[in-house]
UniProtKB/Swiss-Prot annotation:
Name of protein: Protein BeeE
Other comments on record: Encoded by the e14 prophage.
Similarity comment: family membership: Belongs to the phage portal family.
UniProt-listed Pfam families: Phage_portal (PF04860)
InterPro entries registered for this protein in UniProt: Phage/GTA_portal
Organism: Escherichia coli (strain K12)
Length: 157
């Protein structure tokens, strides 16, 4: 019967990496033909390129502001350093539109976006984009911080 074999374990090999987990639940970049598609190869297709470009440019044009919440009242936090980062200059070589276009492009093609926070005097001074393909989630190797909370850990390939 079909249903008797549906819920049985297919192999005894444990899933140990995020890539194996993605393959196990069907989130890999394999196509129905069995060939893998990279984000660079997908961008060579006119339909994919056009869709990603329209999304990225549309979101890139939108204003991005930071707000304080005082009770039930929202106020624009123009005096905050973080407001300047996300609305006027995220880093020394990108405009906010270019930065947000890159964010949306990475989200569409890779599913994630990472930025390195460059800190100066305890405050974030720049947001430097990091290639999502070069970042590995440190599964099970998170450290405990003095406050007792767990934080997600990432490392570069």
């Amino acid at each position: 019967m079909f249903f008797s074999g549906l819920f049985q374990r297919k192999s005894d090999a444990p899933v140990t990496t995020p890539a194996e987990l993605a393959d196990a639940i069907g989130l890999s970049y394999d196509t129905y033909t069995g060939k893998q598609i990279s984000s660079q190869r997908a961008m060579r297709l006119t339909a994919v390129f056009s869709c990603v470009r329209v999304l990225a440019e549309s979101v890139g044009m939108l204003p991005c502001n930071l707000y304080h919440l005082n009770g039930s009242l929202k106020q624009r936090a123009t005096g905050e350093r973080l407001h300047k980062l996300i609305s006027t200059h995220p880093n020394g070589y990108m405009t906010p539109q270019e930065f947000w276009e890159l964010v949306v492009t990475c989200l569409c093609l890779r599913g994630n976006f990472y930025a390195y926070k460059v800190k100066a005097f305890g405050e974030v001074a720049e947001l430097l984009p990091v290639d999502p393909g070069c970042v590995v989630y440190a599964l099970g190797r998170c450290q405990r911080w003095p406050e007792g909370d767990r934080r997600e850990c990432y490392s570069a390939r």
